[in-house]
Amino acid sequence: MDLPVNLTSFSLSTPSPLETNHSLGKDDLRPSSPLLSVFGVLILTLLGFLVAATFAWNLLVLATILRVRTFHRVPHNLVASMAVSDVLVAALVMPLSLVHELSGRRWQLGRRLCQLWIACDVLCCTASIWNVTAIALDRYWSITRHMEYTLRTRKCVSNVMIALTWALSAVISLAPLLFGWGETYSEGSEECQVSREPSYAVFSTVGAFYLPLCVVLFVYWKIYKAAKFRVGSRKTNSVSPISEAVEVKDSAKQPQMVFTVRHATVTFQPEGDTWREQKEQRAALMVGILIGVFVLCWIPFFLTELISPLCSCDIPAIWKSIFLWLGYSNSFFNPLIYTAFNKNYNSAFKNFFSRQH
């Protein structure tokens, strides 16, 4: 008998105790058919690929930063912190989440491992989100305050942001364990999930998502305004077009000089400013895509995480799984987006692989 086609139906062949007592009959003693439908195998393969690719890509970014000496500075320390959080998501969180899906969202690995998994899940995902926020803030200050935001200041601020990111993530993830703020494991129903206590739901979702969401949206709005202001300033520094050549003659009889102006537009713009503007435009585009993907990946999950405990809504398990894995996929997209807009990473990757042969 094929299992229902959804993420939550990748159940193992061993039935639950209730099913054993009430549903086993003569017909159930016949040989079982394949555990997973074709669609289930495809989904399982896709999720397995997502886990492996997320781990490999973030590990590559992290290894490159550690190996290349020129990357041992800002903003690459922020990228390294993001890669650490994302590689931990792929190594510690996603595999157990995949096992959870295969078990039909029934947790059969005990209370301690459940608590550890949930704590790692909240810690690593929250750190990943706040690392994106830190990168956006660093880009914002480097674009809008490049004279004041010196290398020393930038290094100090980035280290503080990294420390605050992991400290806040640890507080949010460990609060249920340290303060008894709700329960993550139910032995009777074999459930393992983030605490459903309404007060903790508000605290965790605001601290892990809604607050950084407000920060990144504000930051990108300011970056957009700064970019528009620069374009406006560049226009005011240019001379209006001249339709025809103009001759200017000196009024003095001796000697007589004639000036002919044939250029349509004269723009006063140092070459250094042009290079800086191009760099800032790439940075603004990178931040915009990074923020956009971050919002699209995580907002469905955090909306349900906030609404469900407050209204006691019963959200179908299939949607919980989809929203959860959509959020996990953000850890796959983060390094792709950042390295795609940085030519130094592309050349560093080529050198990294060429040295292996």
Swiss-Prot record:
Major localisation: membrane
GO biological process, one term: chemical synaptic transmission
Glycosylation sites: 6, 21
Subcellular location field: Cell membrane
Keyword Metal-binding (UniProt): no
Top-level taxon: Eukaryota
Consequence when changing residue 284 to R: Strongly increased G(i)/(o)-coupled receptor activity
Annotated phenotype, changing residue 142 to A: Does not affect G(i)/(o)-coupled receptor activity
Coiled coil location: none
Transmembrane segment boundaries: 37-63, 77-103, 115-137, 156-176, 199-220, 288-312, 315-339
Effect of residue 226 to V: Strongly increased G(i)/(o)-coupled receptor activity
Positions of serotonin binding: 121
Stretches of the chain found on the membrane's Extracellular side: 1-36, 104-114, 177-198, 313-314
Disulphide bonds in the chain: 114-192
Topology term for the membrane: Multi-pass membrane protein
Similarity comment: Belongs to the G-protein coupled receptor 1 family.
Name recorded for this polypeptide: 5-hydroxytryptamine receptor 5A
Species this protein is from: Homo sapiens
Lineage: Eukaryota, Metazoa, Chordata, Craniata, Vertebrata
Gene name as annotated: HTR5A
